[in-house]
From Swiss-Prot:
It comes from Debaryomyces hansenii (strain ATCC 36239 / CBS 767 / BCRC 21394 / JCM 1990 / NBRC 0083 / IGC 2968). The keyword Transit peptide applies. The keyword Mitochondrion applies. Probable mitochondrial mRNA stabilization factor. This is ATPase synthesis protein 25, mitochondrial. Residues 1-29 form a transit peptide. Belongs to the ATP25 family. It is found in: Mitochondrion inner membrane.
Length: 648
């Protein structure tokens, strides 16, 4: 019936009928010019008579006569031949478009107008990821998207139609095939129809519930045009996901964040019927006795946690705090369980004899034994499991109980220590996903991969060069520290290799859309340098930052990478690495990775900012000063000094 109405609306139905049935593609039906001219003449009157009256000065009477004639003519015309006029009850809703920065490509503004004016989407938001903090995981340098557009559709059908039209538009106007996810047609294949008929004979399944995650409720379109990505969601799905908090600036988080609230009260007699139908009698009685709210937090529990912060307490004091905490741990929410873990974690760090790692691991898993948490639709258990894995890896790194069983000054003991960390993580993950069919989403949490890699090495001293130190020196005008030039970490090479193999397998087999970010690549680079493994350091530099990225990054990004490399080498203060850089990567390199001078010329012989130029000059001077007299007489090094001296 719907197809038939659509066909009629496109072929011959009048405008009012077409608008009622929702036909989008149609051709206006209008009367011929001759018919309109004939119908506009007064019937039964001499057309010259109004002119004669006008000559006598009766202008008002002429106007009244003309208006009456027009009304009579309009009433005599069939309704489907009258001129089109929109109903006064239908108001055109003007959608306010977001501000488009001046540096954004014109295609961004084109997409915004297309989504609003042509497709009728609402609540359009634009996020410029190039303006985020460089340390932000979603900065344009850390992932392949520069601009995110979020908008809301009226229904799943509306979103499907808009997504289909958007794909067609990009295909015909940009000669590109966009990548669209979440878009599904409502049409059923013959095999699906037969399967549904077999199900119908057996009766409906009580578990056939998508819980709001229906097809076309969230459609993502990677336009492949100027690194622009478009998300179209239903209003309820958009409120649930709250994607805006991922890509907004830090100062705008409060604007988009929505407070977690308890289940809304409703007078609807059908609310919760589907969920109630699938519950066991015990679960129904349990829910009637205690209502669950994910946002409730027992303030007294948090007060116990604050008492442990920054204090070194005796064993008796710790046990008194534990007794008071457990007495207030009544009808716990998901937040209370997390507070409980952080409370006992602080005790474990202070005194592992009072709270062992085994007990603390059980406390972290206790929340999954709570029936009200498992049955709650307001809690994303997949997200909770990912966060628990992150918290457990942090616990393994800081736990004093594991470290006291190994002599970390011995290389063999360090390897055994790293093996122990990975073994405990594997046991925890096995328990965490024991009764779940989910797979681990390694790309969901920005800290997951860095922490997984962090388990592969042990710090030898307190000063380890990382991305944050490099940022402080470049952008905060920090001073270059004087380090001894010795390795600051020990890396378990076998475990590091296994970790990289696991990440590559996940990106190739599990989630083909996942890719390592530039921040994680820089973490790998600095780890090899801090461990003194310079062969892998330079190999990672060529593959991750130059060789494979020559066709993907512009000259500005190349200069940024060179500046960060020079600052790192100056801080690391390893003479062999400095000599290798000056001989092989400074000018006219024979390596496929290129050289700094080549990329500097491609960038019109300028740095991206004064901060980069200042930090680059100071770092090169520090490297040259660390060389002995023989190396200073090297003509290639004198050319380096001359280049730096001539920088404005």
């Amino acid at each position: 019936m719907a197809n038939l109405l659509g066909y009629v609306g496109r072929r011959s139905a009048p405008y009012v009928v077409r608008r009622f049935i929702g036909a989008n593609n149609y051709r206006y039906y209008s009367a011929s010019q001759n018919l309109k001219s004939n119908l506009s003449e007064p019937v039964g009157e001499d057309p010259i008579e109004p002119t004669e009256q006008a000559s006598k000065g009766n202008i008002n009477e002429v106007q009244d006569g003309l208006s009456k004639a027009e009304m009579n003519a309009e009433e005599s015309v069939p309704w489907y031949l009258r001129d089109d006029s929109s109903s006064p009850l239908l108001e055109n809703k003007n959608v306010e478009l977001p501000f488009v920065p001046d540096h954004a490509p014109s295609s961004v503004n084109t997409f915004l107008e297309l989504l609003s004016n042509e497709y009728g989407l609402e609540d359009i938001e634009l996020f410029d990821l190039t303006q985020l903090d460089p340390e932000n995981e979603y900065h344009a340098d850390n992932q392949p998207t520069d601009y995110m557009i979020i908008c809301t559709g009226k229904s799943e059908k509306h979103i499907y139609k808009a997504s289909n039209e958007l794909r067609t538009y990009i295909k015909h106007n940009y000669n590109l095939i966009p990548k669209i996810e979440g878009m599904a047609s409502n049409s059923k294949t013959p095999a699906a129809r037969r399967r549904m008929l077999r199900r119908a004979r057996k009766g409906p399944l009580a578990t056939d519930n998508d819980y709001g995650r229906t097809p076309n409720s969230w459609v993502m379109c990677d336009t492949a045009v100027n690194n622009t990505c478009i998300h179209i969601l239903t209003d309820s799905r958009r409120d649930e996901l709250n994607l805006e908090t991922l890509w907004c600036r830090e100062e705008d988080i409060e604007k988009y964040s929505t407070p977690e609230s308890a289940t809304e009260e409703s007078d609807d007699i059908f609310i919760g019927i589907r969920r109630f139908h699938t519950m066991t009698p015990f679960a129904r009685r349990f829910q009637q006795m205690r209502s669950y709210s994910a946002s409730q937090s027992n303030e007294s529990l948090e007060s116990y946690l604050h008492k442990l912060t920054g204090e070194s307490l005796t064993v008796d004091s710790l046990r008194q705090h534990i007794k008071g905490f457990e007495s207030d741990f009544q009808q716990p929410t998901i937040k209370d369980y997390n507070t409980r873990f952080n409370f006992y974690r602080s005790i474990h760090i202070q005194n592992s004899d009072v709270m062992s790692l085994e007990k603390l691991t059980s406390i972290l898993l206790d929340k999954y034994s709570s029936l009200q948490i498992i049955l709650s639709n307001s809690i994303d258990l997949s997200k909770e499991r990912t966060q628990d894995m992150v918290d457990f890896m942090k616990l393994l790194i800081d736990s004093p109980e594991i470290k006291k069983h190994f002599d970390l000054s011995n290389s063999k003991q360090m390897n055994s220590y790293s093996d122990e960390l990975y073994d405990k993580l594997a046991q925890f993950v096995s328990s965490l996903f024991q009764f779940s069919k989910e797979q681990i989403d390694m790309s969901r949490h920005p800290e997951f991969l860095p922490l997984l890699w962090r388990l592969s090495f042990v710090q030898k001293n307190d000063t380890v060069i990382g991305s944050r130190m490099i940022d402080d020196i470049i952008y905060q005008e920090g001073d270059l520290p004087d380090l001894p030039g010795q390795p600051s970490i020990f890396q378990a090479k076998n475990r590091a290799r296994d970790t990289l193999d696991l990440i590559n397998y996940y990106n190739q087999k599990i989630d083909e859309n996942a890719s390592t970010t530039n921040s994680f690549k820089e973490l790998l680079l600095f780890t090899y340098g801090n461990a003194g493994d310079w062969a892998k350091f330079w190999n990672t530099w060529e593959i991750s930052f130059n060789l494979l990225n020559n066709s993907k990054i512009d000259s500005k990004s190349s200069i940024k990478n060179w500046v960060r490399l020079v600052v790192y080498l100056a801080i690391r203060n390893d003479r062999s690495a400095i000599v290798h850089f000056l001989n092989n990567y400074w000018n006219h390199s024979t390596s496929i990775a290129g050289s700094f001078i080549d990329d500097f010329e491609l960038n019109n012989n300028v740095f991206n900012s004064d901060e980069e130029k200042r930090s680059f000059k100071n770092s090169v001077y520090k490297m040259l000063n660390s060389m002995n007299n023989d190396n200073e007489s090297n003509p290639s090094f004198s050319n380096v000094k001359e280049f730096v001296d001539n920088l404005d």
